[in-house]
């Protein structure tokens, strides 16, 4: 078994260094999905294995009973998708296909993850030797630690997101808002309970910090409901994974969609709205939305969506609700 101390000493950098091995000639935008997918897969497998061993020790024969896991918010991992099985095939030519099959098997057993996990590890552009090396590195890292597993992986996931955003420069801001900015918004709004909404949620950082705020103030995370939306399918999936590893069940719509042209929460009136919308968005679709009911304070300019974002949020705000917006 891997040394659990690795989870608290340079853990984030250890994972990031492993990610860099995979990069090769790929752009950050391409390989971040591979890396974040592997982190997610290793984490849910580790968490499953811990519960599995606990059930084996109890001796009642329930270690393959899916209800034993889902009742505790643990994703069920089928035998062929467990990390121990993947690790044995790390240095075979089929390792990419093995991981893709594992992702499909996990989605099949866990409806919440359907169509969310990346399944592009078998593609020719991904160096299978390097992929096997990263699997080896992850095999020797324990992704969970009793009593704080969500925070450990959450911290790692957030660290990698920030590093990817830094590498991608301006484009990285589309899926990641610096944690210091997010914390400031959350501390001002104080979302203790009620409906929390982010109309351009990126990787879900606003929701994660809201949940942390509730937990840090001895509140109950079940007292907040999470609603969000993002137009980028890859980012939407990142948000789903980011929230899943923290035990947060959001409503991000059935699919990724443009907030202006396809509002996935048309009747929502949120108690807290926090967002970092794309600044000065020029081509946002006003020609199709001139008569939209959201424009109570005048039609926004066609060449700049800033006023449209503000009005969209006001439209979705409950009578006593509060907005925190980065603009």
Where are these predicted regions, by residue range?
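Conserved S-adenosyl-L-methionine
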Residues: 171-275, 280-284, 289-293, 327
């Amino acid at each position: 078994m891997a040394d659990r101390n690795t989870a608290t000493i340079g853990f984030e950098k250890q994972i990031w260094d492993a990610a860099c091995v995979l990069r090769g000639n790929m752009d950050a935008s391409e390989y971040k999905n591979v890396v974040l997918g592997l982190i997610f897969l290793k984490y849910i497998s580790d968490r499953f294995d811990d519960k599995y061993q606990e059930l084996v020790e109890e001796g009642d024969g329930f270690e393959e009973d899916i209800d034993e896991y889902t009742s505790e918010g643990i994703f069920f991992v089928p035998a062929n998708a467990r990390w121990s099985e993947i690790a044995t095939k790390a240095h075979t030519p089929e390792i990419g296909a093995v991981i893709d099959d594992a992702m499909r098997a996990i989605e099949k057993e866990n409806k919440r993850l359907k169509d969310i996990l990346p399944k592009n590890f078998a593609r020719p552009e991904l160096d299978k030797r390097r992929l096997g090396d990263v699997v080896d590195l992850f095999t020797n890292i324990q992704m969970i630690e009793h009593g704080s597993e969500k925070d450990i992986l959450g911290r790692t996931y957030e660290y990698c997101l920030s590093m990817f955003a830094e590498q991608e420069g301006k484009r990285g801001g589309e899926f990641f808002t610096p944690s210091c900015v997010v914390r400031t918004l959350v501390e001002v709004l104080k979302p203790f309970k009620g409906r929390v909404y982010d109309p351009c949620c990126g990787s879900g950082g606003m929701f994660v910090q809201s949940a942390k705020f509730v937990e840090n103030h001895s509140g109950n995370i079940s007292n907040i409901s999470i609603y969000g939306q993002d137009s980028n399918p890859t980012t939407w999936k990142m948000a789903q994974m980011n929230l899943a590893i923290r035990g947060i069940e959001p409503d991000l719509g059935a699919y990724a969609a443009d907030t202006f042209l396809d509002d996935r929460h048309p009747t929502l009136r949120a108690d807290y709205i926090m967002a970092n919308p794309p600044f000065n968005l020029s081509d946002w679709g006003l020609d199709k939305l001139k008569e939209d009911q959201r424009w109570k304070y005048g039609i926004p300019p066609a060449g700049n969506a800033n006023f449209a974002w503000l009005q969209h949020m006001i439209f979705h705000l409950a009578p006593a609700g509060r907005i925190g917006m980065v603009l």
